[in-house]
Amino acid sequence: MASQLDLIGGDYIAGISINPPTNSRVTSVYSEVQASRIDHTLPLPSVFKTPFKIIDGPPSSSAGHPEEIEKLFPNLFGQPSALLVPNQSNEVSSDQKLKIGVVLSGGQAPGGHNVICGIFDYLQEYARGSSLFGFRGGPAGIMKGKYIELTSEFVYPYRNQGGFDMICSGRDKIETPEQFKQAEETVTKMDLDGLVVIGGDDSNTNACLLAEHFRAKNMKTLVIGCPKTIDGDLKSKEVPTSFGFDTACKIYSEMIGNVMIDARSTGKYYHFVRLMGRAASHITLECALQTHPNITIIGEEVFEKKLTLKNVTDNIVDVIYKRAENGYNYGVILVPEGLIDFIPEVQQLISELNEVLAEGNVDEEGQWKKNLKKETLEIFEFLPQTIQEQLMLERDPHGNVQVAKIETEKMLIQMVETELEKKKTEGTYEREFMGKSHFFGYEGRCGLPTNFDATYCYALGYGAGSLLQSGKTGLISSVGNLAAPVEEWTVGGTALTSLMDVERRHGKFKPVIKKAMVELEGAPFKKFASQREEWALKNRYISPGPIQFKGPGSDARNHTLMLELGAQA
């Protein structure tokens, strides 16, 4: 057992603990649903019900530029993925006592606690006497040596619960030589056999860099990743989905369904709902499939069709006009958080504004506008006044326009209002237009995980534990065959380098795990596209209601996953 000094990772004065670890969750105040979830027994893939062994697949490559990835990961590139299969006897010794660290990295996603519980329970079952340590506050906890030993009593209140508050997360990256040295010193001092990094694409890229660094130094610490992000953009053939996506989409869809019924009840509002997903539009697409809104904007389609901001606005106005002819003066419109990043003309505007702002020649009379290209100025003038002001005033520490702070849904409402007013003046539109804006984001990150996410995460944790015990490093825990019953799920590990490509930054190649964007030829988008015209003019609203843990719908997987796996028409 680690000493109190070890448990707090060095926060002490003269041997006296400043902040001894306490369990911040008090189960006595849990709701009935929370309490019932703690003791909910999770099924496991059948491979964990018998002795198993791990078999290697063929050598792997990368998602792009294999020659550059090989240079960046000389010790890991080409290593095979791994698969757990039943065996006559376990090939790993249950007498092996391991010291494993786990870290949560990046934004929250429902199910993270169950990954940790899965690792913990795996060690209890297959490597008795092992220790699991949680690094506090994300990767910074590794660099600063802040950790706590996780015990059965400590993890118990977090089983099947939302949030990341068991050990908390952070957005720090281990990327400079000094930071790698700090991580090296921490895992060496703790004598860790393995480290599990639970995170998204950036975090798992970092996990692979750590694995390469430790291997190059002949250190015994192995590194395994786990796929986390509600955005759903960390996936591949071997990693079918990232955890948290299922829960977040169902939380958002419940709220969208409620808004739809409100729209129909009042008969006078258009609800513009912005949804999380700064890069890919997976959440927006999935919520559309679950609820059938009147209009859904998919960023990848906007980019593919080279639509302008005016095109997007005109499309919305056209649907509103046609619905008014049918007697409907209300509706629901879904907008992805990252829409602006998909419109090249807006990116050009932001680029030129950054140059103007950097020169500091912004005068109240507007003479600075002469520095913009003609077509860029037209875009700027097309924007509502409030958005123009936001672009000029909201800057990050580097002086650049803060695109993420632009409330796209409010911008679209104002632009639609302007266009409809023009139609009124022309005498072609008579109805009143009232837009209501919503942003559904943080509400979806820490909800109680669905049965699917809870079970999937638990299996990911078991998978990570088995990979570490078998001596694997530089893999991401992978659970497949997800359309089948849980007992038939497959468990293994996918080479992180196989998911990677490179980007040129500051004259050097940097490894990145490629984000999985919405594929316009993929089954989820095709199903949506085949039905959206009907949804636009008729009310085919679905109100999914709250997430269910028992009874009808409780074990349903999301449409995106089932369509991509070919398990849904």
UniProtKB/Swiss-Prot annotation:
The lineage is:
Eukaryota, Viridiplantae, Streptophyta, Embryophyta, Tracheophyta
SUPFAM superfamilies hit by this protein: Phosphofructokinase (SSF53784)
* Record GO biological process: embryo development ending in seed dormancy; fructose 6-phosphate metabolic process; photosynthesis
Q: Where is this site: Important for catalytic activity?
A: K228
Look up the EC number in the record and give it: 2.7.1.90
**Name of this protein:** Pyrophosphate--fructose 6-phosphate 1-phosphotransferase subunit beta 2
- Biological pathway: Carbohydrate degradation; glycolysis; D-glyceraldehyde 3-phosphate and glycerone phosphate from D-glucose: step 3/4
Q: Where does diphosphate bind?
A: G107
Protein residues bound to Mg(2+): D201
Name the site position(s) for Important for catalytic activity and substrate specificity: D202
Chief location bin = cytoplasm
